């Protein structure tokens, strides 16, 4: 059977990384990670979708994501508290991918915060350990300067942990939720195009 058409098929973390690398090579554009991360915010499944849409507070959503993220992805997250701040540290199974993983995750995270929270928190700092192609594009998308340091992390004020989402139920029929669960036609068309590319890459690499 063609794994690209099998909705029950699973892939290993290494296969996932290989597929992502192949997709990046096929696309060849420096904003690939940004576009892929934003596309993920329209996927109505997974721990991130349900955690950020259905948890009672942002703190609960983060803890749920930390607890289960590593079970289904080639990276894991650690939370560190320091005074009035908290940091999310991202670690990839392949160390050379950790900085890209952090930027990809932050683009996704900030978009999910905009979707799910009336007053989404602004990062205090974003740090990476290694250069990433197209870094200026990521900074523009995230609206935050990225600095180089000893970790791949994002920092927020602890006050953000108590924020409540627009709706506790992911499928509550409010305008904001409908926009999220049912993307507009333009986004749907973009998603279909990306889906075709992904299927082609999966077929060639697995």
Q: What do the PLM-derived regions correspond to, one by one?
A:
Residues 1-85:
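N-terminal low-complexity or simple alpha-helical regulatory segments
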Residues 10, 52, 96, 100, ...:
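Charge-dense, low-complexity intrinsically disordered segments
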Residues 20, 62, 106-109, 180, ...:
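Hydrophobic alpha-helical core bundles mediating ligand binding, dimerization, or RNAP-core interactions
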Residues 46-51, 91-93, 180-184:
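Short hinge/gating elements
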Residues 71-162:
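DNA-contacting interfaces and partner/effector-binding or oligomerization modules
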Residues 132, 136-206:
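Extended mid-to-C-terminal alpha-helical interaction segments
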């Amino acid at each position: 059977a063609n794994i690209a058409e099998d909705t029950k098929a699973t892939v290993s973390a290494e296969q996932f990384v290989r597929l992502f690398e192949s997709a990046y090579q096929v696309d060849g554009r420096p904003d690939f990670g940004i576009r892929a991360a934003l596309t993920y915010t329209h996927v109505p499944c997974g721990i991130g979708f349900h955690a950020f849409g259905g948890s009672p507070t942002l703190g609960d959503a983060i803890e749920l994501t930390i607890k289960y993220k590593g079970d289904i992805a080639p990276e894991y997250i650690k939370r560190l508290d320091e005074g009035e701040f908290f940091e999310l540290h991202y670690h990839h199974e392949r160390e050379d991918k950790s900085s890209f993983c952090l930027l990809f995750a932050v683009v996704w995270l900030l978009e999910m915060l905009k979707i799910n929270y009336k007053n989404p928190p602004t990062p205090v700092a974003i740090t990476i350990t290694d250069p990433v192609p197209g870094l200026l594009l990521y900074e523009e998308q995230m609206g935050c300067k990225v600095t180089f340091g000893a970790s791949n992390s994002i920092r927020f004020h602890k006050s953000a942990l108590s924020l409540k989402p627009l709706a506790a139920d992911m499928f509550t029929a409010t305008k904001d939720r409908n926009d999220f669960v049912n993307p507009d036609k333009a986004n749907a068309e973009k998603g279909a195009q990306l889906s075709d590319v992904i299927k082609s890459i999966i077929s060639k690499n697995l």
